């Protein structure tokens, strides 16, 4: 009996330790973002595989003149995965009217031991039928100007001039984004 009590205590502490590790990871990423940096960018084109972006703000310049839904997510994030069908539907419905959905995977900078990581992104895109641009960031400074320290999914709605008009933390129904899109197109 004395052996089960320490194991039971350890099992009760495990979720707390996991939660603490996630909070620390978010704080570290948020702090690194606030430090700025990373001014180089690569040309970004729509691709069936993720493209590395060294600076999200510079990469977004390719979409000036379009309304952009910019979603920060990860393959291992359950709430993020819940929103993907909505983003697929929005891209299908509004692409020809000037909408661009862009997903930014933070998998490459996820905490060690996380089941995601850069190798998980391309297969995830294919198996989920993602029809919109996916960028990956390989360093926290690439997120400069976008705060994801409160958690993911974090989604920004940008107008045609590239200005942020809405920010959402957590899952939102498709109707919320449709309302934003319709007011901006």
Regions found by a protein language model. Name each.
Residues 151-185:
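Thiol-/selenol-based redox modules, centered on thioredoxin-like
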Residues 118-156, 160:
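Short, internal strand/loop/helix patches
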